[in-house]
Structures are given as C-alpha cells and as structure tokens.
C-alpha cells in the first residue's frame, strides 16, 4: 500500500520515489517494519497467552532440563506470521501474484498449525490434529500449488533445476517431475522445521539465515544486470522480485521473535509458526528455482528430520533398538550431557556455515 502512497507523494516531494521505485529500499524498510511490529506486539501477546493459559506441553520422557519449560506460552508463531503479512501489505507490490501466493501459504499452513496447537493446548487433545489429516491437507495444497507454479513459471521458460557451483548446468523438468519435487520440498521443509523447533531459539535462527539466503538469490535472479553479470538465468516473471521483499519480512520478524525466544524462552512459536515457516521456505526455493541451494542452506533441517525417520525405522525393524538416545537429534546431544545453550549455539554455527556455503555458490561457479 505504501508504495502507491509514496508514488503519489513523489509528484509533490522530491526524493520519495526511492520508496516506490527501488526494491532494495523496500527490502530494508519491510525488514525494519516487521522487526518493529514483532517487538511491539511481543510482550502484549505473551501476557495474553499467559492469561489464557496456553502453555507448552513437555514430555515426561524428555530431558529433565525441559521440565522448567512446562506452561511457557506457545503459539507465538501467530506473532511472526501476522507481522509478515502486515509488513507485506504495507511495503509489497500488491499486483504481484507471487506475493499473494506466499501470503496464501502463510494463511493456509498457519491455519493447520493453529488448529493443531488449539487442539493440544486449549482443548487438551493429547495428539492434536491427526498426522494423517495434517499430511492430507498439506499434500492437497502442495500439489495444487505446485501445478499453479509450474504454469506461472513456465511462461518464461524457467523450468530447469539449477545445479549449484555450475554456471551452465541445468536439468530440464517437465510438469510431473516439477510437481513431485515441489511436493516433497514444501511438505518436507514444513515438517523438518517443525521437528527442529525443540529448543530455545534453535529453529528461528536457521530459518532467518535460509530466508536471507533465498532472498539474496531472488534479488539477483530477478535483476537482469546482476543475473547476467553473475551468469544466472534471469527470472523475468512480472512480480517475482517481490519474493526478495517477502524474505526480508521473514528475516525482520524472525530476528525480533528471537528476542523473546532466546534462552530462557519467554514464548515458543508452536506448530502455527514452525509448520508455516518451513512451508514458506520450500515454496520460495521452488519459485526462485534454487531447490538444491535450499537443500544446502537448510541441511540442518534435513538432518533433524532424518534423525527422526532413522530412529522410528530402527525401532520398528530392530525390535525396539534405537540409534539415538532420543530424536530429533538435538535431544540426543542433550541426553549426552550437552547444555541446551551449547546445543543451540553449535547448531547455529553449523547453520551459518551452510548459509555461507550456499552464498559461495553465487560466485564460485
């Protein structure tokens, strides 16, 4: 909305056109806006969650250090998602179909996560939304979205899988391969981030780093000068540049949420936050044709999800024998005696290294 206001005001006041004409300026402004909104609303929301007694449920078989987290306010992901949507409505180009798709993803997956949290925390349903129902909803939406994205992106012929660290190697993709790949990326990312969100601040920093990385790729690939200079395929789809703006909103809101989510956490994001942020990252990766870069930058999420799959598989196939002391893998390290803060910071360091490797692929090609 604001870009239209500044566009009109620029006819009367010189210099204001930078707020409507330059996407780099809007990236800065939306990140600041989402950060400030989250910081401003964080404390009132935490107080409201405490008043409504919407607190974290802690497993009895988990690390003993987690017992102190019991009843810590959760569903704080609503704060992140609201901030992102408001900021996008203020600073985004509302003619961009890609921006609206991302907002729709936030709303849909946010609704799934919210309903799951509501069942568990408010209605005291022990398992929340059944896994098969959750997966069915995610799957139907992901498949429909993948088909829509295929036809939108194929208008400019952007249907090749980009290979990192190569300037000329691209793998052509038809609709079947594209939809299958997008399905696994979106659903896998959504659930992997959800599994990672088990310690204070553990998930939000990798989410911010991956969002920042994908935002940088989106900015480069939708800028013809930068794309040609860095030997990327130019993504000239109208409105696709708004993906970078959206990523900036996620980064700003995520950093502000860390203010409240850092150890000892005052609030957790809950499924409403983690499921949605994971899905959003997957959709962005598909939009900017950087699925493999997303795999590199988000490898921490992949490892967390794989640890659960291996643990469950081992338990079923090896007569109750486990690979890890507890899954996801961050709990394994806790039970080995690592303090929670050490686990979190070391995982952040790993995520930062993966982020830098992903960025290196911009130039090392």
UniProtKB/Swiss-Prot annotation:
Mind listing the UniProt keywords for this protein, alphabetically?
A: Cell cycle, Cell division, Cell inner membrane, Cell membrane, Cell shape, Cell wall biogenesis/degradation, Magnesium, Membrane, Metal-binding, Peptidoglycan synthesis, Transferase, Transmembrane, Transmembrane helix
Topology relative to the membrane: Multi-pass membrane protein
User: What EC class does the entry list?
Assistant: transferase
| GO MF terms held by the record | metal ion binding; phospho-N-acetylmuramoyl-pentapeptide-transferase activity; UDP-N-acetylmuramoyl-L-alanyl-D-glutamyl-meso-2,6-diaminopimelyl-D-alanyl-D-alanine:undecaprenyl-phosphate transferase activity
Q: Which cofactor does it need?
A: Mg(2+)
Q: Which catalytic reaction applies to this protein?
A: UDP-N-acetyl-alpha-D-muramoyl-L-alanyl-gamma-D-glutamyl-meso-2,6-diaminopimeloyl-D-alanyl-D-alanine + di-trans,octa-cis-undecaprenyl phosphate = di-trans,octa-cis-undecaprenyl diphospho-N-acetyl-alpha-D-muramoyl-L-alanyl-D-glutamyl-meso-2,6-diaminopimeloyl-D-alanyl-D-alanine + UMP
The record ties this protein, via InterPro entries, to:
Glycosyl_transferase_4, PNAcMuramoyl-5peptid_Trfase, PNAcMuramoyl-5peptid_Trfase_CS
Pfam families documented for this protein: Glycos_transf_4, MraY_sig1
Q: Which GO terms describe its biological process?
A: cell division; cell wall organization; peptidoglycan biosynthetic process; regulation of cell shape
E.C. no? 2.7.8.13
Give the stretches traversing the membrane.
22-42, 74-94, 95-115, 134-154, 168-188, 201-221, 240-260, 267-287, 292-312, 342-362
Biological or metabolic pathway of the protein = Cell wall biogenesis; peptidoglycan biosynthesis
User: One GO term of the cellular component aspect?
Assistant: plasma membrane
> Where found, per UniProt?
Cell inner membrane
- Family to which the UniProt record says this protein belongs: Belongs to the glycosyltransferase 4 family. MraY subfamily.
Function, please? Catalyzes the initial step of the lipid cycle reactions in the biosynthesis of the cell wall peptidoglycan: transfers peptidoglycan precursor phospho-MurNAc-pentapeptide from UDP-MurNAc-pentapeptide onto the lipid carrier undecaprenyl phosphate, yielding undecaprenyl-pyrophosphoryl-MurNAc-pentapeptide, known as lipid I.
Protein's name in the database: Phospho-N-acetylmuramoyl-pentapeptide-transferase
């Amino acid at each position: 909305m604001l870009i239209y206001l500044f566009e009109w005001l620029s006819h009367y006041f010189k210099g204001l056109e930078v707020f409507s004409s330059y996407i780099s300026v809007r990236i800065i402004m939306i990140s600041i806006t989402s950060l400030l909104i989250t910081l401003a609303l964080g404390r009132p929301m935490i107080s409201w969650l405490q008043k409504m007694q919407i607190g974290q449920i802690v497993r009895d078989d988990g690390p003993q250090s987690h017992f102190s987290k019991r009843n810590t306010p959760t569903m704080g992901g609503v704060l992140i998602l609201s901030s992102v949507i408001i900021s996008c409505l203020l600073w985004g180009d509302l003619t961009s179909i890609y921006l609206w798709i991302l907002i729709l993803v936030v709303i849909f997956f946010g609704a799934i996560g919210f309903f799951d949290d509501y069942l568990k925390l408010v209605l005291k349903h022990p398992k929340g939304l059944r896994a098969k129902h959750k997966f069915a909803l995610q799957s139907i939406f992901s498949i429909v979205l993948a088909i829509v994205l295929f036809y939108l992106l194929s208008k400019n012929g952007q249907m090749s899988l980009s290979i990192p660290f190569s300037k000329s190697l691209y793998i052509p993709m038809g609709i079947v391969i594209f939809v299958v790949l997008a399905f696994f990326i979106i659903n896998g990312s959504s659930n992997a981030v959800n599994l990672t969100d088990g310690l204070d601040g553990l998930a939000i920093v990798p989410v911010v780093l991956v969002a920042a990385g994908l935002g940088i790729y989106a900015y480069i690939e939708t800028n013809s000068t930068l794309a040609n200079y860095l030997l990327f395929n130019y993504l000239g789809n109208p409105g696709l540049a708004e993906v970078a703006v959206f990523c900036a909103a996620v980064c700003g809101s995520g950093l502000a949420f860390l203010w409240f989510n850092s150890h000892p956490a005052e609030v957790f994001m809950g499924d409403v936050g983690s499921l949605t942020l994971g899905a959003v990252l997957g959709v962005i990766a598909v939009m900017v044709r950087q699925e493999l870069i997303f795999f590199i930058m988000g490898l921490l999420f992949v490892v967390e999800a794989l640890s659960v799959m291996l643990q469950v598989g081992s338990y079923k196939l090896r007569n109750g024998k486990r690979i890890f002391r507890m899954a996801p893998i961050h709990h394994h390290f806790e039970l080995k005696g690592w303090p929670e803060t050490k686990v979190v910071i070391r995982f952040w360091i790993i995520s930062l290294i993966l982020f830098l490797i992903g960025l290196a692929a911009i130039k090392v090609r």
